[in-house]
Amino acid sequence: MAEFILAGAKAVQIYIDPADTNYKGIRIAAEAFAGDVELVTGKKPELVDAAEKVTGPVIVVGTMKQNPLIAKAAEAGTLNLSEIDGKWECYVTKLADTVLYIAGSDKRGCIYGIYRLSEMIGVSPWVWFADVAPEKKEELKFTAEELDCVSKEPSVKYRGIFINDESPSFT
């Protein structure tokens, strides 16, 4: 059974291609995820933006038609992107040897894939909003069965938070 160690003796690298038109948003989410890993283990993943800098286990993050490593994996048959092609805010996560791919159908899909990993390591979105501290762990290790996933399209296309500013209870 294939296992992927996110953080053990050291943390994995996270590769984001700077040529991806969604680079800025994806990088922000990847930095947040690296911070989450550090919060849980004390070891921070290194973000790399050049394929030549990758040394060892890596998380390759990007949108499906913008990241050359994701495109290469799809061409080789390692990664099946047909299930998210043309869909709204979807992602695929796939473990292949020492590479964990997170491929989004679009920028938001990719970001949701990154935050799914944060959820898997035990970090709540409330860590920032309400200081909910995650459980500390020495090692973060997952099997391919736990990591491999194809998300569904959201049932509501446009969603958000409405703040009632007519009678706010913020004071």
Predicted regions and their residues:
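Acidic, contiguous N-terminal accessory segments
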Residues: 1-92, 146-147
